[in-house]
Amino acid sequence: VQPPFESRSYVELTLATLRQFGVQASWQDELTLHIPGGQQYQPALAAVEGDFSQLAFFAVLGALGAGPQGVRLTGVNPQSAQGDRQVIEIIRQMGGRIVEEPEGYLVQRAAMQAGQIDLADCPDLGPVLAVLAAHAQGESRLYNAGRLRIKESDRIADVQAELQRCGVQMHSTAEEMFITGGGPYAAFEPCQAHNDHRIVMALAVLAAVGCAPLRIDGAEAVQKSYPNFFEDLQNLGVKVEIAND
């Protein structure tokens, strides 16, 4: 692997799946992976884990006050190798109230404080953690974020454009985002999806907590990863209207 080795957690998750089906691999050093040839996959019973990258939107909703008793998140493995599992610890470090339960977590409202957030192994969390930072007291720094520029959109530039449209104080460099918490927020023109499912969902979270109603053009981008996102949002009591124009 050529350095810098970012998103290592995705490699570890793949290796865990290989082992589950009988294929062995081992690290010789931090950057060298050895996979012996001639191995055969073996059948196995496998349970598909819940996705922490999608859970993150509802974890942030719970931390910022959605749901009268908080938001209960089930169907995930707290010991998962998924890098996006870091969202739980990030919210805790910023002051969030999270109770681990047998099948997941209960996330409850808390006063959030600014944080220093390393996105090297969890870049997909960038958009929704930017929304969390917009509601935290002080200036948050999201760093090792350069991979966000080569996702479905330039997630640094486009998240900045949309959050600033809503009144969020944010600036960025090639690899970092700096966000000063505040609110309430409002946009006086439609927000844009940039054909990016995670930007749509992050903006929906922003709209649901501490923001005037938002119109998000191109919201159908959620079909890529979470077609039922808006239905699940409605189940938490968030008002969602689908515009046909």
Language model features with spans:
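Short, structured segments at the rim of ligand-binding sites
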Residues: V1-D245
